UniProtKB/Swiss-Prot annotation:
NCBIfam families per record: aroC (TIGR00033), PRK05382.1 (NF003793)
Protein name: Chorismate synthase
Entry keywords, A to Z: Amino-acid biosynthesis, Aromatic amino acid biosynthesis, FAD, Flavoprotein, FMN, Lyase, NADP
Named cofactor requirement(s): FMNH2
Enzyme Commission number, as recorded: 4.2.3.5
Superkingdom in the source lineage: Bacteria
Catalytic activity: 5-O-(1-carboxyvinyl)-3-phosphoshikimate = chorismate + phosphate
GO biological process, one term: chorismate biosynthetic process
Keyword Amino-acid biosynthesis: yes
């Protein structure tokens, strides 16, 4: 089972990630990790932090001669901004009397709840660990599982369909063609846009909306469209709640900072339709074998992969750190004040798509390993080929 842990604060010396359970023999390059980190830093509407950091992962263990060796992979991502925070975020020297405590929580952030939960007298520790800066470590961790899946013909990609008031009118005409080529083709096409949208008209309108929000001291959220292609039928299980593939994917997506909603396929649209217009009809036989002509289930039926592209939609709320502040209060005095501003983005939805790609990779990898077993890439590949061949033979005439 692949699992990972991250550590580090936004303004500390570094972020780190440890990935355990990677099979041996997975080919890996520095670009497999660092290219994903670079994608996370892109996107129109990002803040000043992106001008400071150029994220690169230092792999400390678990890889030899360009292949994983089965032991935990440890990675370090240094924070260049640390040099400006050595006093405020010192690990051992006590600079409490030199640093002004932050006691004004921002509405919508972890500030207040984290302050109360952990008994702090200063919000700074909450800000620095709850920050979405932590997702850099998760993208690095997810890139390992992503490389594993890619070598088995499974690809992950995303694009953005909504930013603030701007939505694409319909699914892009090129979507199916991109998915047929693999979800990474979809991601590559989306990456050509500064807002990762596929519709040029929507892109122009979204950029204008971000500019207006920035001028107003406001922020914007949006919707991520995530696809996973090449997933064989039968991953996950209906037998127990904690083995349901859709629930595991939803949990992974919901763990991303500022994500407040998830649906598998067009779930909320499906809820407004009769069943006869929702369920994907089944066909078998002939050269095409088992097939469906629609994918309103989003690639998951009965909490198991159906063999179609898995489609996940994720709603990101607007970032909670506003230049134009909302009402708050001072935790030290309980006096009403305006909330404070912490350096932030106007819109981070394009980056959220990249993070979403990263966090679902270990979920799919684990479902595949549960189905096939194996400790080395060669035996896993062989078992998957046998399984895919058996599926083809079962439904072809």
């Amino acid at each position: 089972m692949i699992r990972y842990f991250t550590a580090g604060e936004s303004h500390g010396p570094a972020l780190s990630a440890i990935v355990e359970g990677m099979p041996a023999g997975v080919a890996l390059t520095e670009s497999d990790i660092n290219d994903q980190l670079a994608r996370r830093q892109q996107g129109y509407g990002r803040g000043g932090r992106m001008k400071i950091e150029t994220d690169r992962a230092e792999v400390l263990s678990g890889v030899r001669f360009g292949k994983t060796i089965g032991s935990p992979v440890a990675m370090l991502i240094r924070n260049r901004d640390w040099e400006n925070w050595t006093t405020s975020m010192a690990q051992f020297e006590d600079h409490a009397t030199e640093v002004q405590k932050i006691t004004i929580p921002r509405p919508g952030h972890a500030d207040l709840t984290g302050f109360v939960k952990y008994g702090f007298d200063d919000i700074r520790p909450v800000i620095d660990r709850s920050s979405a800066r932590e997702t850099a470590a998760r993208v690095a961790a997810g890139s390992l599982a992503r490389a594993f899946l890619r070598q088995l013909g499974i690809q992950i990609g995303s694009y953005i369909s909504t930013i603030g008031p701007v939505s694409e009118a319909a699914a892009p005409a090129s979507l199916q063609e991109l998915l047929d080529a693999g979800a990474e083709s979809l991601a590559a096409e989306a990456d050509k846009s500064p807002v990762r949208m596929l519709d040029p008209e929507a892109e122009t309108a979204a950029i204008a909306a971000i500019d207006q929000a920035k001028a107003d001291g406001d922020t914007l959220g949006g919707i991520v469209e995530l696809y996973i292609t090449g997933v064989p039928m039968g991953l996950g299980s209906y037998v127990q709640h904690d083995r349901r593939l859709d629930s595991e994917l939803a949990a992974a997506i919901m763990s991303i900072q500022a994500i407040k909603g998830v649906e598998i396929g067009p779930a909320f649209d499906n809820a407004r339709k009769p069943g006869s217009q929702v369920h994907d009809e089944l066909f078998a036989g002939g050269e095409k074998g088992l097939r469906r002509e629609t994918n309103r289930a989003g690639g998951i039926e009965g909490s198991m992969s159906s063999g179609q592209p898995i489609h996940i939609r994720a709603a990101m709320k607007p970032i909670s750190s506003l230049v134009s502040p909302l009402s708050s209060f001072d935790l030290a005095t309980l006096e009403a004040v305006q909330s404070r501003f912490e350096r932030s983005d106007t819109c981070a939805v394009p980056a959220a798509g990249v993070v979403a790609e990263a966090v679902v990779a270990p979920v799919i990898a684990n479902a595949l390993l549960e189905k096939l077993g194996g400790d080395h890439m060669a035996e896993i590949k062989e078992r998957l080929e046998v399984y895919r061949a058996a599926l083809r033979m079962r439904f072809e005439k």
